[in-house]
Swiss-Prot record:
The keyword RNA-binding applies. Its main location: cytoplasm. This is Eukaryotic translation initiation factor 3 subunit D. HAMAP family: eIF3d. Residues 288-302 are annotated as: RNA gate. Component of the eukaryotic translation initiation factor 3 (eIF-3) complex, which is composed of 13 subunits: eif3a, eif3b, eif3c, eif3d, eif3e, eif3f, eif3g, eif3h, eif3i, eif3j, eif3k, eif3l and eif3m. Belongs to the eIF-3 subunit D family. It comes from Xenopus laevis (African clawed frog). It is found in: Cytoplasm. mRNA cap-binding component of the eukaryotic translation initiation factor 3 (eIF-3) complex, which is involved in protein synthesis of a specialized repertoire of mRNAs and, together with other initiation factors, stimulates binding of mRNA and methionyl-tRNAi to the 40S ribosome. The eIF-3 complex specifically targets and initiates translation of a subset of mRNAs involved in cell proliferation. In the eIF-3 complex, eif3d specifically recognizes and binds the 7-methylguanosine cap of a subset of mRNAs.
Amino acid sequence: MAKFQAPVINDNALGWGPCAIPDQFKDMPYQPFSKGDRLGKVADWTGATYQDKRYTNKYSSQFGGGSQYAYFHDEDETSFQLVDTTKMQKTAYQRNRMRFAQRNLRRDKDRRNMLQFNMQTLPKSAKQKERDRLRLQKKFQKQFGVRQKWDQRSQAQLKPRDSSVEVRSDWEVKEEMDFPRLMKMRYMEVADPTDIECCGAVEYYDKAFDRITTRNERPLRSIKRIFHTVTTTDDPVIRKLAKTQGNVFATDAILATLMCCTRSVNSWDIVVQRVGSKIFFDKRDNSDFDLLTVSETANEPPQDEVNSLNSPRNLAMEATYINHNFSQQCLRMGKEKHTFPNPNPFIEDDVDKNEVASVAYRYRRWKLGDDIDLVVRCEHDGVMTGANGEVSFINIKTLNEWDSKYCNGVDWRQKLDSQRGAVIATELKNNSYKLARWTCCALLAGSEYLKLGYVSRYNVKDSTRHVVLGTQQFKPNEFANQINLSMENAWGILRCVVDICMKLDEGKYLILKDPNKQVIRIYSLPDGTFSSDEEEDDDDEDEEVEEEES
């Protein structure tokens, strides 16, 4: 007979629920689970992922999050291989980076949504007004030369530079050479020069100027001496030499202008006279050829008005004045001189020799191939005595500081003693053409040293008083390498210009550097251009006009 068997009831008198675990459920793991969970799964591909970690813990399901039912492999098998899926602990920087990236994504999304909303609600009239405003803005920017850079700063438009001489309508262009083509020129078959004649006398350098620093600066004195800047055809020595030797004649300053022309920015001109089979390179009378430019190759060269203290011409006249005075002040004036065999050819009989600047002239000859016989008048500014008493010829030039706030300048009074390399690097950037010409002249003359003086204004707003802050000495060959001046390229440019001039007919020509382009042009000039007779006729006409007006 069937018998009812009463179940065992666990009575929990102190609480709710069973007081003991049945035997069949002992040691059984438990976790919240869902019927959709797979027991013993290797990887969880069903869980929902959130890109934004802020909402992960709030809205994600906790079912299947435990590891009680996960599969753990006890023994290694050859059929498959376990993969380490543990996550690397992120640094605080990585966590913050992800947080900022998510925030930026939300902002971009909100901005796009707002822009889309505005475009949807913008009426046609407002759209048309916005288009008109943008169109006018672009038009004004093109008209006034305003260009917005990435940092929203407008760069001032450079003024167009003036030509060194006005090109007339009856001048004909014979040749045009651009700088990129000239930079590729090379000529290496240059023989060593031979000295034809040496003239003049030079004074000895005062080594006390080598001890000048910014703490014991020395005032620059105004020295009244005569400087002769005679052009090629007016040189009596070159006229004498042209009868017997040479077919190309020039001065070192004119040749250096041509040989380093690819660094020039401002306009300059050289007169070429073809007489028979000979060529003479000249400079125009009363031109600015001998004025020293200031910050010519700077990114933002001086562009003040003509009457301003810092206008390009006033700065050039100031630099020339400083260079002349320093080149004489740093010598032992009135004392022993180093004299060449021949006297100075430019001193007149009624002029005191002590009133003439210390300059010696060396006439040298180069053979450029079989057909070019070059004769050049070179200059020395002084001499030095070495430790063993040997004599070294030097060229003395001056760098001047006018205002360190412009042209990315460096304050010389603070940096010249401690960071002289930074000063010369800045000057090389702002005056690359001038330094290259000086170096080329020193190499042509065969000077052993190039002396550079650093002269600054006593007051920034006063261009009449200056002080010497220091000096520096270079060997021309080493300095040419430092400033990346290739003499092979310089001789190549000169040979190219000479070959072109040799193909021209007899007459007068002009080599002109374009004021706003990297181009030099050769013009043929009518008879009488730049002659003294033409200037006298112009003066007579001016006098007649003044008499009629009076």
